[in-house]
Amino acid sequence: MKTTLTSFFTLLLLLSCSENLIIKEENLHKHIKILSSDEFEGREPGTKGGEKTKNYIKEHFKSLNLSPVSNDYLLEVPLSKMVVDLDKSYVNINDKTNIIDLLPGKEVVFWTKQVKESLEIHSSDLIFIGYGIVAPEYGWNDYKNIDVKGKTLVMLVNDPGFELKDPKLFKGKAMTYYGRWVYKFEEAARQGAEAVLIIHETEPASYPWQVVETSWSGKQIDLKRKNMGADRIKLEGWITSMTAQKLFSIAGLDFNKLKKQALNKDFQAVPMTDLKLSASVNNIISFSKSHNVAAIKKGRVYPDEYILMMAHWDHLGKREEHTEKNDHIYNGAIDNATGVAGIMELANYFSNIKTDRSLLFLAVTAEESGLLGSQYFAEYPPIDLSKLVAGYNFDAVLPIGKTKDIIVVGYGASELEDILKEELDKIGKYIMPDPTPEKGFFYRSDHISFAKKGVPVLYADSGVDKVSGGIKVGLEIANKYTNLTYHQPSDEYSPNWDLSGFAEHLITTSRMVSRLANSQEWPKWYDGNEFKEIREGNKN
């Protein structure tokens, strides 16, 4: 009996040690240092640095004897690049007597996702459509009792729950997918609209007008879709709140009154009297391609069922005009050499472990251009997405050291959080809910491409409640990164980084993955989640 107990505890010790030996901080340091070095030139897709990055990840997967998803570890992602020629393009609003030219950058930002050198809109009627949301699970339909085909829709950003801070309405102050600008353009296209102008307001958008101006002006990279964007609306854009109020006034409408009315599910869309939009959009177009890097560890029993571990490999590249200490390389050490290093270490860990289900390791491209690599994988999947059990995403993990918590972005989404809690309880850690749910970060990283297809996903970070220093010190580190380092040349690797917390995060993830990979569990979205019906439809 004594011998048996000794053997049992020895086995437990070996298992524990094996985890810590395989999830090695020194390997994380090595990968992050290499991927964020000047040699990789900021990892911009379509550049020499981008090629180096893809090949580095590919060779790592290959060295572990992981299988390619198809014939190669590199999965092509076709891209289009369009620049609106503002000297030849315009948007104006006219009524029976006046033509109002909207000033690009100052009053309006506009573009098209239809890959055409030029397109025009002539006298399209303006309609105020409230929030532009169709959400059956909330009994909400802003498009009821109105035909918007060929019309220009003017709408509010975010969703009604944010404005009222009512937890019973959508998700209260927490943004839902229905509040995201990308959803609003998608829904308008499904409804047959010709153009959309979203009214910008800083608080519900969670960023100032300057962000809109810089993000949607100049070069716009998108997927080169097979239909060349023919299913998108002709014109997508934003207008300032002041511009919106001016247009409502010209139409004889009270903007603030209608904004309040739009908070009610009985709201009925309002035609903006005689106001019509005309536009001409002229594009300079080019095409390129990048690649996702994918590898599979085949399962023994259910090889066609998958657990996903993912991160985006791209960053912002080089900006020759930058003069900060003559540093023009955006190295992206935290964003997102950390995440890539994480999935490379998880691949290393699982390469020698047999599982019943297959494991999919995916490093996606063009996240910084709008989550394009993950979107392409999800839209043209090389595997059956209905057999994708769950996904784990790593994006910009702070080297903050050991913490008592794990932050779950988009907290309250799926049963993956229950599994995470069970694992954290075993080691005396806890889940910290998303501290800023109103900013909608859950919808701003690559896992959302899979959530939109119904796949439960977990987007977690290593936490801020430091074992040494507590939440105050952790938040200081996080805020310093956000304010001084995020998307700056200063996002560089340091050998002094404390990656012990990240290593613990990866160990916890490995245990969650192991549980799902050796069972027939199918985690579900929580009731009321906007992706729940999609998942249930796929399973049926």
Annotate the PLM regions.
Residues 41-167, 273, 290, 415:
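Noncatalytic luminal/extracellular "stalk/propeptide" segments of secretory-pathway proteins
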